[in-house]
Amino acid sequence: MDVIREIVEEERKFFKRYRDYAKMIKEVAIKELKDARVFVFGSVIEGKHTPSSDIDVLVVSPNMPKSMEERAKIRAKMLRRVGVIAPFEIHLVNPKEFEWYRKFVKKFEEI
């Protein structure tokens, strides 16, 4: 039971300080992509997150690689920066792909 409690406490810190971690992700985005906007969305923004929730982060850049492999490399750098076990779901998109998200996501918080 102590292990579960430790995991819950560890994840709770990410939710309490999600903006700080999103700023870390943004630092990597700027370094790798030069021009990037970072948004948080989903249950954490809506105040509806649960212990099983993740924190959705959307990185938008006109310099986003087309290759999914290159995007995966950037995502890996971001996760290493915040902690691989961090409960972040990082979405990497170009401005055109961002328009698709805007159709479905009601609320974004720009970092």
Language-model-derived ranges and their functions:
Residues 1-39, 45-52, 62-111:
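Catalytic core of pol beta-like nucleotidyltransferases
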